[in-house]
Amino acid sequence: AETLSPASSPTSLPVGEWHHCLPSQSGLLPEIDNALEYPQPALKSARDSDAPDVFGSVAVPVAHTPLDTKWQSASQAKLVSSSGPWAQMLKSASGQSRTVKVRAVNNWVNGHVRFTDDRANRQGADRWSGAAETLRSRRGDCEDYAIAKMKLLEAIGVERGDMYLVIVDDLVRRADHALLIVRIGDQMWVLDNETDKILNA
């Protein structure tokens, strides 16, 4: 997978009630082998406040972003957990630890969905699809992967307030890139369609 660097002003859209914008920062997103089995000590607890600690920065609340309309449409689309190609995976992961759930959903979505760039197929229009649409069509771009993972994790008990959709700047491809951030204990972890490895945020 290509190494990503956060944008100078990346945007984090929490799956809960607030939208957040992360402040300026530097450095690369580290790739951690077996990160979930051997997490690094947190510099600060993500539960010390409502704002998540992501990429070494703490998010601050903002009222609105230019992505609100796309986010509302995609995040409110229904996903029936017991009906669809995802049903067996969810059944197997249900009742497991959050770590197992996160890994199962990340691996399944990455293997099930084929990356398709909206801007190449829709004459420049970037559309955010609901999870069921993405998973049934088996096509989507990075934000579609992230939204699908969020909805699947929600279906097996991961709270919305512990998940964040984050937009970063991929300096290698020179394009925006969407990731799902999930809280596990006091750590924040990155789910990326570019890799099955869980990355330390």
Predicted regions and their residues:
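A structural boundary/capping signal
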Residues: 1-201
